[in-house]
Amino acid sequence: MSTPASLSLAAVIPCHNDAETLAPLIGALARLGPFAQVIVIDDASDPPLHARTLLKAAGKQARAMPPDWLRILRHATPLGAGAARNLGLSLVTAPHVIFLDADDMVLPDLADLARDLAHDPTARSFDFCIFQHHDTRGDQERLWGQRPFDDRLWRQAGLALGALGPVGPDQAALLVQTANYPWNKIYRTGFLRDKGIGCTPLMVHNDVELHWRSFLLADRIIASDRIGVVHVWRPKGNRLTNRHTAERLRLFPVLDALAEEIALSDRPDLSRAFNAFVWGLADWIGAHLPAEDRPALHAHAARFWLTRTPPEARQALRADRGALLDRLGIG
């Protein structure tokens, strides 16, 4: 029996000194089947990545792929995952794309989802499909799947169970509040290009823009309960997620521009969700930021409060999250 046809997918993967985890990921992508392209952006790894070495470590099926299946481009200096993803996207020729991290693991459900999307009438002409994932922070708790906050939002949206289904505006306003990850979505390449959607070229928080503008500008969103990717959480080491410096404050001009774009869209549901997201993120940044950088954070927070937080949102924040405002210096 022949295997049902699948979407043609490209995988774009930034990598900085992660060859040991990248090679197994490349091997898994070769085995899964729907990946027509794998584009790796070497973000100034030391030593540099080499296709032959990676394919040797990735296994027999990866080595049997066509010569142009794996493409590696290199940044001479580290520019971050956002710039790497943007470069990778510019080279995609497949009609659909997924952005993966070099230490992610992909599961058979991802290939099944690609086949679902190719054959289910409800999925025709989708702009992106958001799917579920497993976060390894749950391993110690013997929990499989997403973190409780994200899982609760999926349940509130009525989408926690069901292999494939369209996402309405009210449901989108809930799912947009999930963690701003790039690797839990399959995008239509033309959608990203037509709308000018990409990542922010920052070292940290570079996926916020991709996440929110995708939800804002998509005409057709699909959701799937399939768990397609394992997100490996590494609380120690030199990973960008573990860097808590003033560079995180560079996100605030991006947040300001996003708030303006969302406000002009006449989507009050997304505006409320985004405002709540910004204040939660600012509080998280403040909890990890060195004391000498907190006055700058408070200045950014005060500016966002005055210019981007409408009166009704201020009232709700004062009533429900007064302690948060105190921590951010909002009187």
Labelled PLM ranges:
Residues 9-21, 25, 32-33, 41:
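A conserved hydrophobic helix/loop-capping motif in glycosyltransferases and polysaccharide synthases
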Residues 1-5, 31-35, 60-70, 83, ...:
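Membrane-interface aromatic/basic loop that binds lipid-linked glycans or pyrophosphate carriers
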Residues 97:
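Short aromatic/hydrophobic "clamp" motif used to bind/position activated sugar donors
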Residues 7-10, 37, 209:
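Cell-envelope/extracellular polymer assembly enzymes that use nucleotide-activated donors
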Residues 26-74:
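Acidic donor-binding segment of Leloir-type glycosyltransferases
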Residues 102-205, 209-224, 230-247:
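Donor-binding/catalytic cores of nucleotide-activated saccharide
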Residues 75-92:
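Glycine-rich, basic loop-to-helix element that forms the pyrophosphate-binding segment
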Residues 223, 227-331:
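C-terminal subregions of glycosyltransferases and related glycan-biosynthesis enzymes
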